[in-house]
Regions:
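Small-residue-rich helix-interface/hinge motifs
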Residues: 2-29, 48-104, 141-145, 149-169
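Short hydrophobic beta-strand motif reused across regulatory alpha/beta modules
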Residues: 287-295, 352-361
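Bateman (tandem CBS) regulatory domains
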Residues: 239-252, 262, 305-318
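Alpha-helical transmembrane segments and adjacent TM-loop junctions that form the membrane-embedded core
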Residues: 144-234, 273
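Membrane interface segments of multi-pass transport proteins and intramembrane proteases
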Residues: 9, 13, 125-139, 168-184
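Membrane-interfacial segments at transmembrane helix termini in multi-pass membrane proteins
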Residues: 205-256, 368-392
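N-terminal signal-anchor transmembrane helix
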Residues: 1-48, 93, 340, 359-402
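The conserved cystathionine-beta-synthase
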Residues: 254-274, 280-282, 299, 319-340, ...
Length: 402
């Protein structure tokens, strides 16, 4: 769900402003408004007014930068969900990745290209004759900030534009998008640590809290690069797994000719704390799944002479998936149908196992060597939902859109 203040629409793209944006605008206005040289030039009120104007022009430049990314993405048929301005600049929320490294490069370079164009434009405006001195100052500052915005964003590390360009280059060279993301994310983490180090050195050298600004930006880059890396690792791990890798044989095969009374007496009363899965079989063939819900639909007076075969649901009529299918197909099916469990079938349509969300998380953790306790797995099974930080349904959607 999108957060922040919706302030309008540009080219059918919703524009949002985060609460942190107001803080940075006020801070920039204060710094410019309290500058003695400005106060001397245009007075206190004029200094504050021009400071506010500079802040608006700065974020207008950021908005145009993000709009550059967005319009190129739209030209490739990619939906742009929103553009948001916040403390550290702006971000365009794009529905999916570009299909090719060349298209990914085009989306990435568009933002810095807009910033360079704005730098040239404001530089030329500043050379016009007859402009007031304060106008020349503001125009010059906006020109410089656009140049800085372009150059900073070209640093080759995610989530910066340069990281996206680096990712596209590695993707092109290796024919692997995940390899490109991995390299660019690692580069972004290096950049993030560099920013943090620079900020701390600046702070201790100057004693000014403004020296910490590079550290805050570095922390932002580090966290986002880490998020890219984690998401890439999860996607890569998921695409290597088959449904059979997650299926478990936690079910019982019963004689299809067993009476419903015998079934109820021998199995339903033995363990009320678990929810076992039952399949009916006869003559070496599976006849279907037997559920408590179907048993309850039968009058108790009929239990003596009705058999499991009479209430068994054929395997191809219950939620099922082939063991040869990618695990991502099972994840998508569970989410789309809001199912608790799937029956996994062999190519001959026999039962290979069952799987639920807990089994999927266990298989993924094993694939990626992630430590996860059985208690967490059982909690996922009971709740029928993935943990908050591991929304595999959304991750699979991202894989399929890539």
């Amino acid at each position: 769900m999108q957060t922040g203040w919706r302030v309008g629409t540009l080219f059918n793209i919703p524009l949002f402003i985060d609460n942190s944006w107001f803080f940075i605008v006020l801070l920039i206005t204060f710094l410019r408004g309290s500058d003695p040289s400005r106060i001397e030039l245009v007075g206190p009120a004029g200094a504050w007014a021009t400071g506010f104007l500079y802040a608006l022009l700065l974020f207008s430049s950021v908005l145009l930068h993000e709009l550059g990314h967005s319009l190129v993405a739209k030209a490739q048929g990619i939906k742009v969900n929103s553009i948001k301005l916040f403390l550290f600049g702006g971000i365009a929320s794009i529905e999916r990745e570009s299909k090719t490294p060349g298209e990914a490069f085009q989306v990435a370079i568009a933002g810095p290209a807009v910033s360079i164009a704005l730098f040239v434009l404001f530089t030329l405006l500043g050379r016009l004759d007859g402009l007031p001195q304060i106008a020349n100052i503001i125009i010059g500052e906006v020109a410089i900030v656009n140049l800085i915005l372009a150059l900073f964003n070209l640093i080759p590390g995610l989530p910066l534009d340069g990281g996206q360009i680096f990712k596209a280059a590695v993707w092109k060279a290796t024919k692997s998008r995940t390899t490109g993301v991995r390299w660019a994310a690692k580069a972004g983490q290096f950049v993030g640590w560099g920013g943090i180090s620079l900020g701390l050195i600046s702070f201790f050298a100057s004693g000014s809290f403004f020296g910490l600004w590079p550290a805050l930006i570095g922390l932002f880059i580090l966290r986002n690069a880490g998020a890219y890396n984690r998401m890439n690792t999860l996607q890569e791990g998921l695409t290597k797994l088959k449904t059979s890798d997650a299926a478990i044989r936690d079910f019982r095969v019963l004689d299809a000719n067993m009476s419903l009374r015998q079934f109820a007496d021998e199995y339903l009363l033995e363990d009320k704390t678990s929810s076992p899965v039952y399949f009916a079989s006869s003559d070496g063939r599976y006849r279907g799944m037997v559920t408590i819900e179907d048993l309850r639909q039968v009058e108790r007076s009929e239990w003596e002479h009705r058999t499991l075969h009479s209430i068994a649901r054929p395997l191809l009529e219950i939620p099922h998936i082939s063991e040869t299918k990618p695990l991502t197909d099972a994840i998508r099916l569970l989410e789309e149908k809001q199912l608790a469990r799937l029956t996994v079938l062999t190519p001959a349509d026999a039962v290979a196992g069952t799987l639920d969300r807990g089994d999927i998380v266990r298989a993924l953790a094993k694939q990626l060597n992630f430590p996860i306790t059985e208690a967490i797995i059982q909690k996922i099974k009971q709740e029928g939902a993935y943990p908050a930080g591991l929304q595999l349904g959304a991750i699979v959607q991202a894989i399929e859109k890539a």
